[in-house]
Amino acid sequence: MIDYDKINEYVARVKELGMDSAAITDHGVMYGVIDFYRAAREAGINPILGCEVYVAPGSRFDREVGSGDDRYYHLVLLAENNQGYSNLMKIVSKAFVEGFYYKPRVDLELLEKYHEGIIALS
């Protein structure tokens, strides 16, 4: 996760290292993507937008303490294109509205429904 107050420093360092692309993957949120996108574009850097989502072991709707469903796993998702960005926003929004249990969680159902244009890292 990158602190969005440090985005300009991050982009400057990417430029200094001669890289032409860089990604941002906040944990469970996408608060920094707009600022990062603007700063990267201004610097001639290709911005790759993403999110490190929390994946529930079962359903995102499960809330029973001690059932093992209070755990979660990390998964990095990157938007490959505009459709992917739109789907990533839907996934993250639904994680908060429908899956929030200590953290905003997604499940396989959400990932299957909104997979188009998304690159998942393992």
Predicted feature residues:
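Phosphodiester-processing cores and adjacent nucleic acid-binding clamps
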Residues: 1-122
